[in-house]
Regions:
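Conserved acidic
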Residues: 1, 110, 185, 310, ...
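… and, occasionally, acidic/histidine-rich disordered N-termini of signaling adaptors
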Residues: 83, 87, 120-306, 352-369
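Sensory modules in modular signal-transduction proteins
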Residues: 6-41
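PAS/PAS-like sensory domain cap-loop motif
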Residues: 43-55, 194, 209, 317-322
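C-terminal catalytic subdomain
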Residues: 76, 298-307, 312-370
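Sensory coupling linkers of modular signal transduction proteins
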Residues: 2-10, 95-126, 313
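N-terminal capping loop/helix in small sensory signaling domains highlighted by a polar->aromatic N-x2-3-F motif
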Residues: 31, 39-50, 258, 309
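Terminal output helix/cap of sensory domains in signal transduction proteins
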Residues: 52-84, 341-347
Length: 370
């Protein structure tokens, strides 16, 4: 076995100290006895200016070469330390002579700028996440509460794929005899889509406030005018479904603006769910305005209408198969309960939802609790 003095001689005579002295990084070599075999010029200069650094380096020798610290004799270690107000990346590697552990070489690199940048990025990211959580709370708070509004009992589930969502639904009281309900899905996710949902809520309320006698088709045409005036990216669009309930004759007049998730109506008398279908184009500033066809439906006591967005039917199982419209219709026909339906979708889904999932159920014929 090689002796310690021979190892120290090897360390002092076999390294290219010219290269190490040319480095801006601090470098020192410690033999297996804990003696300093070499310190490069950059570290010598730093030691002359800092007692704190001297103390740290002395303490570090004892830590590195303690009997319990066997890992330093076999493995390269990298850690970050704050020394004299600066951040350093410290790389410690074992040195071997004739197969035996001879000592360690330490390289201290100043990474203060990088560390400050990482801290700034972390804080900025934290602020952004806090802002997104705030927006999400606002989004959730502007949705109708799960309660009864006149003859309409509403229950909803709002589950964004990200912190904020591009889905929205709302109930608007037009007058004592009529209420409007809409659901919309803005293209994309995140902050941009969530801001668009705010635009939709404000715009829809303003339209009904100014034009209470508008039909669903007229509302969509007016909404499109407001949207095109924004002069935003031509790739931005949204889909929506709008219905106006008239409690005087128990009728529902509805129109569709490209919403590819037609609501499902479940009638107690028929014990099966069916689609509320009507054609219409999505609202976009690159697609010409549509006339938006309307249909009228006679409602019965205890009818249930399920509203949803495409994240619901696009949930996938482990084989990549989508939940789909027909499965949703069948499950809604069997269950008729929004919580049970939501659980069925979650059980079917194999991974994190790729899109926002929004469900809203209206039961017709409840008592007024307002």
């Amino acid at each position: 076995m090689t002796g310690s003095l021979e190892k120290t001689h090897y360390l002092r005579e076999n390294f290219n100290f010219f290269i190490l002295n040319a480095m801006d990084d601090w470098v020192r070599i410690i033999d297996d006895r804990g003696e300093v075999a070499f310190v490069n010029d950059a570290l010598i200069d730093a030691l002359d200016k800092s007692e704190t650094l001297k103390t740290y380096l002395d303490d570090n020798i004892d830590l590195l070469l303690s009997n319990s610290n066997e890992v330093v004799k076999t493995t390269t270690m990298i850690e970050e330390k704050l020394i004299d107000g600066k951040y350093y990346s410290i790389k410690t590697s074992p040195i071997f002579y004739d197969g035996d552990f001879a000592g360690t070489i330490e390289v201290y690199r100043d990474i203060t700028s990088e560390s400050i940048l990482k801290i700034d990025l972390y804080n900025a990211n934290k602020d952004m996440i806090d802002d997104l959580r705030f927006v999400r709370r606002i989004q959730a708070s502007i949705l109708p509460k799960n309660k009864t509004y006149g003859k309409l009992k509403i229950s909803g589930i709002y589950n964004p794929s990200e912190k904020v969502s591009g889905d929205i639904y709302d109930l608007i009281k037009i007058d004592e005899n009529r209420s409007a309900f809409y659901i919309a899905d803005v293209m994309g996710h995140g902050v941009k889509a969530s801001i668009m949902t705010m635009f939709l809520k404000v715009s829809m309320s303003a339209i009904f406030d100014k034009h209470p006698d508008y039909s669903p088709s007229q509302v969509f045409l007016n909404l499109r005018k407001k949207f095109t005036k924004l002069e935003i990216d031509s790739s931005q669009y949204f889909t929506a479904w709008l219905g106006i309930f008239d409690f005087r004759d128990d009728s529902l007049v509805f129109a569709n603006a490209g919403h590819n998730c037609p609501p499902l109506i479940y009638r107690q008398s028929e014990k099966i769910a069916d689609y509320l279908l009507v054609s219409g184009r999505m609202i976009s500033n690159i697609i010409e305005a549509d006339k938006y066809k309307e249909k009228t439906l006679k409602l019965e006591e205890n009818d249930k209408i399920l509203f949803f967005t495409d994240g619901t039917i696009e949930a996938k199982n482990e084989n990549g198969k989508e939940y789909g419209l027909e499965r949703l219709r069948e499950e809604f026909s069997k269950k008729g309960d929004i919580q049970a339906l939501y659980q069925n979708i979650r059980d079917f889904n194999w991974q994190q939802m790729a899109d926002d999932l929004t469900l809203a159920l209206i039961e017709y014929g409840g008592n007024d609790e307002n």
